[in-house]
Amino acid sequence: MALAAALTACSSSGSPSGGGQSASADPKDATGTVTVWLMDDAQKNWPDLVQRVNDEFAAKYPKANLKLVYQGWADKVGKLDKALADGNAPDVVELGNTETMKYVLSGALAPVDRTTFDNSDSWIKALANTCTYQDKLWCVPYYAGARVAIYNSAAFQQATGSPDFPKTEGDLLAALDKISDKNKSDRTFSPLYLPGPYWYAAMSYVAAYGGSIAKFDSSGNWHGTLHDAKSQQGISHFADLVRKYNKGDLTQNEQNQYEAMARGHAASFYGNGYEAASVVAPGTGDASLKDSVKVATMPGPDGKPLPTFIGGSDLAVTAKSPSVALAADWVRMFTSTKSEQALADKDILPNNLNQLNPLKNKPTTAAAANAVPDAWFTPLAPGWGAVEKQKIIPDMLAAILKGKSVDQATKDADAAIDQLINSPS
């Protein structure tokens, strides 16, 4: 549930963008309330950045107010849809980059001026694309996410004689087998903790085999392609890994997968680079693992690194906000060079290449930072939001792990995707 805090407002310098209320010529005379919905990742991992930005906004706009509300991923979309329908939407909302197109197409977001935001000329292209429609910018990239292998080097050392994560999948599977044998007395120990509904991972294997979730055809429509042979290969490969190496509850999703390692139940898992910090953080994990938990590139089945989903978040100003200029200025501040550097310093991938490039040579971020150029993304289709909301792909994976054939499960999933993907959700 969200944590609400009434705070004096915050923002950085730059020209106001969008419509609605405009900031006063003298910022100290500007009034209004800016309600911001941020995901609880910020509350858990970079609350100091949030506080600094809010303090700066308060200093610039002393007569304005900020209401900050932290949201959880599980129910944010439902809450936002209701808030928009009821006419009480936030002024600023954080959107996962697979969620943005739904709200762009529904007219829920206000356009913003790209030129007024720091580093906009070097934004990561895949992130900027999620905010762009008909040559207008409807949101601002916030941070990127690329998935990597997170592993306990001590567990690998004990079982294989090497603390290093294997560079090829063949070597990785051999190492996982040795780890499994070493820990066979513990039936809850997973050499590779790979959650069954983890569709971001499953689709990475689909991408590795040359498959895709959906394609845009010559008639101008999207259609599901999970039933294609290459996609089926990737899905089968993923399911085989889950069955063999995940000794936990196969129905559990990846939201708190770091806990398996923190509790001593996993030697490795596939996640966002920042999840390694959660494994060893005193509040969420086991600090004694600090020297053992490492990150590495996840090898794929084709002799190359496993293609990663380019995850991340965007920040948008809602179209009916009475404080559009103030809201856009808060976003400008929160995505400034200074703010993005604060994220980079915490091993979070910033929204632009200028600040991303140094992370390619940093041991704790190299695997994720170098994965960004070859990353894949979900279809930028009108109804993709509905496909996600209906959990079509996680449900397909669950059915396969319960015994449904890959052929039938993918055929059914494509049919469900086809019903939704071309209609704005």
Task: Please state what every model-predicted region is.
Residues N97-A146, Y205-A208, K290-A296, N361:
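Hinge/lid segment of periplasmic solute-binding proteins
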Residues D55, A59, Q157-A159, S236, ...:
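Extracytoplasmic/periplasmic substrate-recognition and gating elements
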Residues P90-D91, N119-A155, S190, K304-P307, ...:
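A structural signal for short loop-to-beta-strand junctions that line the ligand-binding cleft
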Residues E56-W123, T132, Q157-T160, G264-S268, ...:
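Extracytoplasmic "Venus flytrap"/periplasmic binding protein-like
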Residues A126, T130-C131, V293-T297, L343-K391, ...:
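Long, aromatic- and glycine/proline-rich binding clefts that accommodate carbohydrate-like moieties
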Residues L176-D177, G220-L250:
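Glycine-centered hinge/linker elements that transmit conformational signals in sensory
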Residues M1-K102, L250, D302, A325, ...:
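Conserved N-terminal structural module of periplasmic/extracytoplasmic solute-binding proteins
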Residues W138-Y142, R147, D171-H223, A266:
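Extracytoplasmic/periplasmic solute-binding protein
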